[in-house]
UniProtKB/Swiss-Prot annotation:
ATP binds at residues 610-617. One of its GO terms (cellular component) is cytosol. This is DNA mismatch repair protein MutS. One of its GO terms (molecular function) is mismatched DNA binding. The gene is mutS. HAMAP family: MutS. Pfam families: MutS_I, MutS_II, MutS_III, MutS_IV, MutS_V. This protein is involved in the repair of mismatches in DNA. It is possible that it carries out the mismatch recognition step. This protein has a weak ATPase activity.
Length: 846
């Protein structure tokens, strides 16, 4: 550190050394200043004016600053850009400091650890996620610090990690330094952490300390070794940034994929669950569903959509609760009550972190006051899930009484401003306040005494925050001021003085004010500690209010949108009668054309043909969305639905270049298709829209044929497969499990008319030129296209059906299918090897 730096700059550089990767906001009077590279970066990110202060190595030191009273706005902008900030405050008294005022970092804010209400999106979880990889395993741990949730999951494939990142949308990723990351991680704010934080023994120690246990076996650590290391690194980071205990993180939730209907990253995007295809929040499934009354409910609804349940029994408890709310007509009254509730979940987190503001406590009190009314409203609803909710929203009279007696009804925003603790709560505080508040009466009395003593008629006593208390005389009478009047200030028309008696009074009053503020701050901190004992009950209350809000919202959606309860059955299959698209239907001015669908084990694929814009993709997507809605417990847009067990939803709909990874449209399409063919099972729902585009007609048709046949006959997945290759409509002749359907269209007065009805059989043409005309292709181009099409149709088909060759049956595979390996003797196994070898020789000759 250069000795030529001023003491203040030396202090800055010393503090900055501990926070090299963060922007250091260094408090100087009414501003937070930034220096050197921090100043340059902040000026670019925040459009600040870059100035200079002093010199370093004979060069001016760059400086930029923001007003302290507006700092929250600047912090919010930095967090959105993935930046982290260390707030360095003046903690010493400038009046008594020798040299620079003592300063220290009092607050660290990172994108994934922020809990301040002003810096968060109320309706989105704010996730901090750590990734660790070892031995072909990917362990992830994530925490929502504002919600008190801590989750772990073990993965085996990168595409699973991609799916979780798309679902969770973490604000910040933690990785071990020098760890290579997949390209899709570049969409997030990544922090590389030292290797020692990703240590198994260190992780075990930190987790045991956090959860006050000596062993983690109760959490199932043996099944999550990699994820536990990630969890340890995450806790180490939280301890560094929060500088305190985290009492609201009380347990680990171990995510198990078999509990949920799996949705990969492509499926989440293709179905437009959380945002539309352009990245906006409107016209997606969440935007149609989210009519929640409170922010807690909104966040929970999004979590439900991202993790649809597999267990029918749990789903049915949600259905029963919704049915009963409808029957008892409770949705409107409950919605109005919940709407008045505060964001208890995030208030609890701020209480745990001792950062709750006075108005947080008032909002919490107002929610506690509402609990008896909510509880009474639910009294008649005896369903299993509502009974569980009622247990958690019981009144908390002791906490309510504490808050009512401790905090005034309308406190200032910050405790530092004082006037937060209610009169009568603390006797010592009341005495200090009385001394301060009675100052005016004492001042009037002193003024009259001095007037009587001196005979000076213009004498007045006053006060301001700069000069303190003073005696004021007009210029005319100032010459008669007695000797014990000591001049304090000269103004144009008056002189101001201080006397020993007035100085004594000033010290007493100002001391009382200072002591009152200190006492109030101490009382407030103690109050937060006392409330912390209620964190378990308040956390349960928050979860139950959020769950009730989602159930009430799904009730309202079911009634407003004319949705019905789906039937979940143990028998395999999917049946939808008069299904509609949940997002498109509410946006249409005209009536939506409903369509039926049935898939069953012996007829598990629909081969869908029809014109572009004819409704094929809508029909496919609405099927997947109806299935997904059913698995979160929602009613669905259909007259009747019957669903058997399902494990995953896959989609391959639309494609575009992935420039960041250097992949063409065709490569993206093939990668998604390969993932489906490798992972789908007989209980998966698969949507494939147009395989084979982006390559030659022959290659494309061959790939479409093979994929279609493999899904239908080998995997036996429930599949909706749309295509423009009309030659594929011959497949049902070879595979009885495939059925042709098409979207109707007709030509009227030379114009194509889309009927949007799904009918049996295949389309007899694609209507491509008619759709091109709608798109505005010039008439001379269309005329030429018609002439060329007629020439092709008159001479030959683009691909003769006989060129699609049914895969030959292998004698070796036929023989292997007959074998039960568990029942073979050693002699039979040896004979079998010779037989298979002979068959292999025959195949090679043929």
């Amino acid at each position: 550190m250069a000795s030529s730096h001023t003491p203040m700059m030396q202090q800055y550089l010393r503090i900055k050394t501990d926070y090299p990767d963060m922007l250091l906001f260094y408090r100087m009077g009414d501003f937070y200043e930034l220096f050197f590279d921090d100043a340059k970066r902040a000026s670019q990110l925040l459009d600040l004016t870059l100035t200079h202060r002093g010199q370093s190595a004979d060069k001016p030191i760059p400086m930029a600053g923001v007003p302290y009273h507006a700092v929250e706005n600047y912090l919010a902008r930095l967090l959105k850009k993935g930046e982290s900030v260390a707030i360095c405050e003046q903690i010493g008294d400038p009046a008594t400091s020798k040299g620079p005022v003592e300063r220290q970092v009092t607050r660290i804010i990172t994108p994934g650890t922020v809990t301040d209400e002003a810096l968060l999106d109320a309706r989105k979880d704010n996730i901090l996620l750590a990734i660790h990889t070892q031995k072909q395993k990917i362990g992830i741990a994530w925490v929502d610090l504002g919600g008190g949730r801590f989750h772990l999951q073990e993965l085996t494939e990168e595409h699973q990690l991609n799916a979780e990142l798309v679902r969770l949308q973490p604000a910040e990723l933690l990785c071990k330094e020098s760890t290579p990351l997949p390209s899709f991680c570049s969409n997030f704010a990544v922090k590389f952490r030292p290797g020692w934080e990703f240590d198994a023994s260190n992780a075990h120690k930190l987790l045991c300390e956090q959860f006050s246990v000596t062993d983690l076996s109760a959490f199932g650590e043996q099944n999550y070794p990699t994820a536990l290391i990630a969890a340890g690194a995450l806790l180490a980071y939280l301890k560094t940034t929060q500088k305190q205990s985290l009492p609201h993180l009380t347990t680990l939730t171990l995510e198990q994929s078999e509990d949920y209907l799996q949705l990969d990253a492509s499926t989440q995007r293709h179905l437009e669950l959380f945002e539309n295809i352009h990245g906006g929040g409107e016209h997606c499934l969440l935007s149609i569903l989210d009519k929640t009354a409170c922010a807690m409910g909104s966040r929970l609804l999004k979590r439900w959509l991202g993790k649809p349940l597999k267990q029918h029994a749990i789903i049915q408890t949600r259905q029963q609760a919704i049915k009963e709310i409808i029957f008892l007509q409770q949705d409107v009254s409950l919605h109005q009550l919940i709407k008045q509730c505060a964001d208890v979940e995030r208030i609890v987190s701020r209480i745990a972190l001792k950062s709750a503001r006075p108005r947080d406590l008032v909002s919490l009190l107002q929610t506690l006051i509402l609990l008896p009314a909510i509880h009474d409203e639910l009294q008649e609803n005896k369903t299993l899930l509502i009974n569980e909710i009622k247990k958690e929203i019981s009144p908390l009279p002791l906490l309510q009484q504490l808050l009512e007696t401790a905090i005034i009804d309308n406190p200032p925003m910050l405790i530092r401003d004082g006037g937060v603790i209610a009169p009568g709560f603390d006797e010592e505080l009341d005495e200090l306040r009385n001394l301060s508040s009675n100052a005016h009466e004492t001042l009037v009395k002193l003024e009259q005494e001095e007037k009587n003593r001196t005979g000076l008629s213009t004498l007045k006593l006053g006060y301001n925050s700069v000069q303190g208390f003073y005696i004021e005389l007009s210029k005319a009478q100032a010459q008669n001021a007695p000797p014990h009047f000591h001049r304090k200030q000269t103004l144009k028309n008056v002189e101001r003085y201080i006397t020993p008696e007035l100085k004594l009074f000033e010290d007493k009053v100002l001391s009382a004010q200072s002591k009152a503020l200190a006492r109030e701050k101490w009382l407030y901190d103690n109050l937060l500690e006392e409330i912390q004992q209620y964190i378990p009950e308040l956390s349960d209350l928050a979860k139950s209010l959020a769950q009730l809000d989602v159930l009430v919202t799904l009730t309202e959606r079911a009634q407003s949108l004319n949705w019905n309860c789906p039937n979940l059955v143990p028998e395999s299959g999917i049946m939808i009668q008069a299904g509609r698209h949940p997002v498109i239907e509410p946006l249409l001015q005209e009536r939506f054309i409903a369509n039926d669908l049935e898939l069953k084990p012996n007829q598990n694929m629909l081969l869908i043909t029809g014109p572009n814009m004819g409704g094929k993709s809508t029909y496919m997507r609405q099927t997947a969305l109806i299935v997904l809605l059913a698995h979160i417990g929602s009613f669905v847009p259909a007259d009747e639905v019957r669903l058997g067990p399902l494990d995953r939803i896959f989609t391959r709909i639309g494609a575009s270049d992935d420039l960041s990874s250097g992949r063409s449209t065709f490569m993206v399409e093939m990668t998604e298709t390969a993932q489906i063919l490798r992972q789908a099972t007989s209980q998966s729902l698969v949507l494939i829209d147009e395989i084979g585009r982006g390559t030659s007609t022959y290659d494309g048709m061959a790939l479409a044929y093979a994929s279609c046949a493999f899904l239908a006959s080998t995997i036996k997945a429930y599949t909706l497969f749309s295509t423009h290759y009309l030659e594929l409509t011959e497949l049902p002749k070879d595979f009885s499990c495939i059925r042709n359907v098409h979207l109707q269209a007709s030509i009227k007065t030379g114009q194509i008319v889309f009927l949007y009805r799904v009918e049996e059989g295949c389309a007899n043409r694609s209507y491509g030129l008619e759709v091109a005309e709608l798109a505005g292709i010039p008439k001379e181009v269309l005329k030429l296209a018609h002439e060329h099409l007629n020439q092709i149709q008159d001479t030959q088909s683009i691909l003769v059906q006989t060129q699609i060759i049914k895969p030959p049956t292998s004698p070796i595979l036929t023989e292997l299918k007959k074998i039960d390996p568990d029942r073979l003797t050693a002699k039979e196994a040896l004979d079998l090897i010779y037989k298979l070898k002979q068959l292999e020789c025959v195949e090679s000759i043929n």
